[in-house]
Amino acid sequence: MRKGVLNPDRDRQIVEHELQETGFSPETEKVKNKNFEEDEEEEDESVEKIFESREVPSWKKQLTVRAFVVSFMLSILFSFIVMKLNLTTGIIPSLNVSAGLLGFFFVKTWTKMLHRSGLLKQPFTRQENTVIQTCVVASSGIAFSGGFGTYLFGMSERIATQSGDVSRGVKDPSLGWIIGFLFVVSFLGLFSVVPLRKIMVIDFKLTYPSGTATAHLINSFHTPQGAKLAKKQVRVLGKFFSLSFFWSFFQWFFTGGENCGFSNFPTFGLKAYQYKFYFDFSATYVGVGMICPYIINISVLLGGILSWGIMWPLIETKKGDWFPDNVPSSSMHGLQAYKVFIAVAIILGDGLYNFCKVLSRTLSGLFVQLRGPTTSISRTSFTLEEDPHASPLSPKQSYDDQRRTRFFLKDQIPTWFAVGGYITIAATSTAILPHMFHQLRWYYILVIYICAPVLAFCNAYGAGLTDWSLASTYGKLAIFTIGAWAGSEHGGMLAGLAACGVMMNIVSTASDLTQDFKTGYLTLSSPKSMFVSQVIGTAMGCVVSPCVFWLFYKAFDDLGLPNTEYPAPFATVYRSMAKLGVEGVASLPRECLVLCYAFFGVAILVNIVKDSLHSNWGRFIPLPMAMAIPFFLGPYFAIDMCVGSLILFIWERVDAAKAEAFGTAVASGLICGDGIWSLPSSVLAIAGVNPPVCMKFLSSATNSKVDNFLKGSI
């Protein structure tokens, strides 16, 4: 739930669902520009001079009961939304604006009521707002990094049956062990970067665009002009939240059977519907399309056209030649293998290229920084508010920086506490995890924990330069290395998937916390309050997210199955990666490996071309990561997203100012309303209440057969 500037690396972060582990993926440039424009006149004076007369509360007073009550409420809301997105397509847009707006609205309403009754003891400050933002990001982020749509669900028998490798080991979800696993692995990353906070934020002056933009959002809320706009945005969000919720409620009445309802409307005809080209009336993905950059939506649509419009129909003609003609459509020895492994090849190619690119930037930037203290890292990073090269005579820079640095260094977190916490949690985790996963030997875990601080630093440093977390890439690296080390005969698949979870949680939370330190630095929030808020939010997420997943798991018996409401596509992808790591490529159908190599190379080539072209032309090159998603799922959600883009495009042409101010609020309302409908729909399913009507679309010929059958049976 972070915001930042628009760039190709961050565009990928929005679409690869794993890269939402930076909290939530960054917002687009239009949202950032909106906040900058709102604050433009104020910043001419200096941001901190605006707040100079307001007392900065101590770190303990920043941690209020009302802040954590609001955070808990919002965490439940956003956990449902993220879980639904995780289990449908895996595309999780930035919900940062929603969290910031709703957090501001709830506490502001609370304090206003107390003020009228004469019971208000502490005003609502930007520091408290930052605590809420941090807590909600940490909590609902577990709904993603917990692996409910990836590595964790990929261990289940339901996913293993689709992959045809049940014998390789399964571990079905259970509320007890999932909560225990998350508590064991989710806190370690927080301690790994605490000693480096001053180096990252003050000495290296890393910009962390998402954290900086989030701070701008919060600062703007607490100015008179920003508060007025925030109230209007909340009203708009609430209006479209209600519209989206009741639209989902209305659609539910017509889903009383398989492939029933508006979500199966054959918009472009039945033949196109067969290849998943249709508009499914999803308010969620229309909203996602309004938030995601245009190039993301176009890339996803192009990927859908390339795969479902061209490749899969052609490969289907090779049935009986390239693969057996008697295997079911879901078999990994048939067409399904091409869908999954070609998508995996593109994801790995794109991930490998960008891993090398970000790592090279990280190492070169670090080398330059260590060589000379006067050399600024900002040459290879994004500049939002701070300019390390600014003249020391600049009153704005000197005053703001001095005040922020003074408050940032005021509350120190002892190094012994961070080191001791890391060692204690690592030792506890090393002892407990082998009992949860007997395939994951204690020495595998020990190796991960020895390497983790270095990788966590690299990830946090790289995020400061590029605003892009590579946690999912480190997780995939763990799948292959630990899986191959364990071997096929010793449970390598489960060991690799479990190791993926351990690694992802460490490096993900490390970059998240460093982003939060940057946000806290710019809002004068104490590092101690940021750390405590992150810990409490993570603890909330370790309980809330498994409970939300469990509700989905118990309510929908077809969860994780292809062509259902919740196919959980990346669970199959992650298990396929683990299978590839322990078995090699011998089990793939004919020509599948050749196609995988080809698309792996094409993904790297497209990235090279995109980065080598001038930004004016490179921004038109599609993103391989985005193109890979519909290879497995189909292009129906891409059509929804493009509809969202079209709505926003027309709105910007008609009234650009209102589109900038309220576009994200409208999109967030659409996403939140449809997402929260998952709660009552799950409860209805558990209670055995079924929709009363099945609205299904048939061809004329099929309809005649059905009519004749019904007449004959009367």
Swiss-Prot record:
The keyword Transmembrane helix applies. Residues 27-36 have a biased composition (Basic and acidic residues). InterPro entries: OPT, YSL-like. Coiled coil: none annotated. The chain crosses the membrane at residues 67-87, 90-110, 135-155, 175-195, 236-256, 295-315, 340-360, 413-433, 445-465, 477-497, 531-551, 593-613, 631-651. It is found in: Membrane. GO terms for cellular component: membrane. It is a multi-pass membrane protein. Pfam families: OPT. GO terms for molecular function: oligopeptide transmembrane transporter activity. Residues 17-44 are annotated as: Disordered. Keywords: Membrane, Transmembrane, Transmembrane helix, Transport. It comes from the Eukaryota. May be involved in the transport of nicotianamine-chelated metals. Belongs to the YSL (TC 2.A.67.2) family. PANTHER family: METAL-NICOTIANAMINE TRANSPORTER YSL5-RELATED (PTHR31645:SF62), OLIGOPEPTIDE TRANSPORTER YGL114W-RELATED (PTHR31645). NCBIfam families: OPT_sfam. This is Probable metal-nicotianamine transporter YSL5. The lineage of its organism: Eukaryota, Viridiplantae, Streptophyta, Embryophyta, Tracheophyta.
